[in-house]
Amino acid sequence: MALPNQQTVDYPSFKLVIVGDGGTGKTTFVKRHLTGEFEKKYEPTIGVEVHPLDFFTNCGKIRFYCWDTAGQEKFGGLRDGYYIHGQCAIIMFDVTARLTYKNVPTWHRDLCRVCENIPIVLCGNKVDVKNRQVKAKQVTFHRKKNLQYYEISAKSNYNFEKPFLYLARKLAGDQNLHFVESPALAPPEVHLDIAAQQQNEADLAAAAAQPLPDDDDDAFE
């Protein structure tokens, strides 16, 4: 399906909407993919930048047309035109800012009101920053809504490909799909050392084993 400002390509392509509070790192994340950044198009009627991100899988090439809001979410909600025809989504929050996580349910509701039954990934960004406010055990929304959750660090490229691989597998209906080469990414601006990565993964595993609280707000008392 060709959407405004999207050239048609002869391989599978999908509209990916990225939502979340302003300042959570959505634009930084999308811009890591260098060819997508080079080929982005501005869609003035809706006020978004559309980045075509190509990935190479064992089943051939796949493209995500990533819709980036260009910061307009800071002035209230996004128009329905941003969501219409969305085929998959990423909801992003900032692990150093609690309010951005508390607003995740609102973004999820707005998304699901327009796009029913699409695969959604929740991403906690900025795990490279030391003063983390939202701990792994406090992130429970994805478990209640059956979403996939990844912790990422856009500036260090940590886990950059994981949300895209999850969505590609869901959209292709093939859990064995995998990327056969990495896209060209911008050089890391910060480095997340191996010990920090291992600690993150251990914290996530421990959090997944905990029973769910009755209410998300309990975790922040």
Curated annotation (Swiss-Prot):
Q: Which Pfam families match?
A: Ras
Q: What's any one GO cellular component for it?
A: nuclear envelope
Residue ranges of the Small GTPase Ran-type domain? 10-174
Region feature Disordered, mapped onto this chain: 202-221
Q: Which residues does the annotation say bind GTP?
A: 21-28, 71, 125-128, 153-155
Q: Any idea which UniProt keywords this protein has?
A: GTP-binding, Nucleotide-binding, Nucleus, Protein transport, Transport
Where does it reside?
Answer: Nucleus; Nucleus envelope
- Region annotation (Switch-I) maps to 40-48
> What's one GO MF term for it?
GTP binding
- Per the annotation, which location comes first and is thus the protein's main one? nucleus
Quick one: where's region Switch-II? 71-87
Q: Which GO terms describe its biological process?
A: protein import into nucleus
Under the heading InterPro entries, the entry gives:
P-loop_NTPase (IPR027417), Ran_GTPase (IPR002041), Small_GTP-bd (IPR005225), Small_GTPase (IPR001806)
> Low complexity bias: where?
202-212
Provide the assembly information. Found in a nuclear export complex with RanGTP, exportin and pre-miRNA. Interacts with RanBP1a and RanBP1b. Interacts with PHRIP1. Interacts with KPNB1. Binds to PHIP1.
So what does this one do?
GTP-binding protein involved in nucleocytoplasmic transport. Required for the import of protein into the nucleus and also for RNA export. Involved in chromatin condensation and control of cell cycle.
Which family does this protein fall into?
Belongs to the small GTPase superfamily. Ran family.
Q: What is this protein called?
A: GTP-binding nuclear protein Ran-2
Q: Which organism is it from?
A: Arabidopsis thaliana (Mouse-ear cress)
